[in-house]
Amino acid sequence: MYAIFQSGGKQYQVKEGQTIRLEKLNVATGSTIEFHDIMMINDEDNIYIGDPILHNSKITAKVIAHGRSKKLHIIKFRRRKHFRKHQSHRQWFTDLEIINVSY
């Protein structure tokens, strides 16, 4: 059984027991969080599709850790003009463990 839900403007496909990395959520480490913006649930026998979301359904997850991803380097360069520009970025993330998918 898997579900597709929306968080932070992105959609994720998850199963029970799976670990997933999302954009940073302002929730304490070790606490549980519920997602109600579920778009689709695929049970072994049935497929439930929302219009646009499924009502009376939720995904329960446990917050494992917060952190920052590897550094991403952005380099701008113009040939023959002696122009080089360098920037870096590290994105915050939250790791979750999916506990339960219910509908």
Curated annotation (Swiss-Prot):
Gene Ontology annotations of biological process type: translation
Keywords, alphabetical: Ribonucleoprotein, Ribosomal protein, RNA-binding, rRNA-binding
GO cellular component terms listed in the entry, alphabetical order: cytoplasm; ribonucleoprotein complex; ribosome
GO molecular function annotation: rRNA binding; structural constituent of ribosome
Stored HAMAP family: Ribosomal_bL21 (MF_01363)
Family to which the UniProt record says this protein belongs: Belongs to the bacterial ribosomal protein bL21 family.
Subunit structure: Part of the 50S ribosomal subunit. Contacts protein L20.
Functional description taken from the UniProt entry: This protein binds to 23S rRNA in the presence of protein L20.
The protein, known as: Large ribosomal subunit protein bL21
